[in-house]
């Protein structure tokens, strides 16, 4: 009897999981970063297709990217979107609007610099970086690309910079300090930087 009950519970969970996944997917926002025409040389000639790059996020601190290839554009976008959903990562955000600290990212020849910004700054970043920030839910940030303008390299470099973000609680626990000590230092540093800018 106990085994039968366990099996029934397992079946119920299996039935509930797809619904939960559907609800989660419905909350995600996707953006098409770029699409290219590709060709594969085979014995009989060339097979042409399309490669799509898509970023997906819930605008609450989770985002991912994916790349898909297919003969038709819609199918390539669908594959890229599905891959992006499987690659979702959570990025800690300060006040749910900006980054906790500045960061650098790199992938191949792509290099990006991301800087936390005060309220009202907006998203000062172009192209692929802006798409990533919008699906992630970042409202105030300054981003700059210093390397390759290849969309794929820029997206990978942006995520490399984002994955380096650390929550003040995590940093405080590792250093044996209080959260207020970490936040206080950050505030003091920002005020000093503001004073230096005003003097210059």
Swiss-Prot record:
Gene3D superfamilies to which the protein is assigned, alphabetical: 3.30.160.20, 3.30.230.10
SUPFAM superfamilies given in the database record: dsRNA-binding domain-like, Ribosomal protein S5 domain 2-like
Biased amino acid composition, Basic and acidic residues: 1-22
Region of interest (Disordered), residue spans: 1-26
Pfam families noted in UniProt: Ribosomal_S5, Ribosomal_S5_C
Boundaries of every S5 DRBM domain copy: 28-91
GO cellular component: small ribosomal subunit
GO molecular function: rRNA binding; structural constituent of ribosome
GO biological process: translation
Function: With S4 and S12 plays an important role in translational accuracy. Located at the back of the 30S subunit body where it stabilizes the conformation of the head with respect to the body.
Family that this chain belongs to: Belongs to the universal ribosomal protein uS5 family.
PANTHER family to which the protein is assigned, alphabetical: MITOCHONDRIAL RIBOSOMAL PROTEIN S5
Domain remarks in the Swiss-Prot or TrEMBL record: The N-terminal domain interacts with the head of the 30S subunit; the C-terminal domain interacts with the body and contacts protein S4. The interaction surface between S4 and S5 is involved in control of translational fidelity.
Protein name in the entry: Small ribosomal subunit protein uS5
Taxonomy of the source species: Bacteria, Pseudomonadati, Pseudomonadota, Alphaproteobacteria, Hyphomonadales
């Amino acid at each position: 009897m106990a085994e039968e009950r366990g099996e029934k519970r397992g079946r119920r969970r299996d039935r509930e999981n797809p619904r939960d996944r559907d609800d989660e997917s419905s909350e995600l926002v996707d953006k098409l970063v770029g699409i290219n025409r590709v060709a594969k040389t085979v014995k009989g000639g060339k097979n042409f297709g399309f490669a799509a790059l898509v970023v997906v996020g819930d605008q609450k601190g989770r985002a991912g990217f994916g790349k898909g290839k297919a003969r038709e554009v819609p199918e390539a976008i669908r594959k890229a979107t599905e891959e992006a959903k499987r690659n979702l990562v959570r990025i800690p955000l300060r006040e749910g609007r900006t980054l906790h600290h500045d960061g650098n990212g790199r992938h191949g020849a792509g290099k990006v610099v991301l800087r936390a910004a005060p309220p009202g700054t907006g998203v000062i970043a172009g192209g692929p970086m802006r798409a990533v920030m919008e699906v992630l839910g970042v409202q105030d940030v300054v981003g700059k690309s210093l390397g390759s303008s290849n969309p794929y390299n820029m997206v990978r470099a942006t995520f490399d910079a984002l994955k380096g973000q650390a929550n003040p609680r995590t940093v405080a626990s590792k250093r044996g300090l209080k959260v207020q000590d970490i936040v206080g230092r950050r505030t003091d540093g920002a005020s000093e930087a503001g004073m230096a800018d005003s003097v210059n």
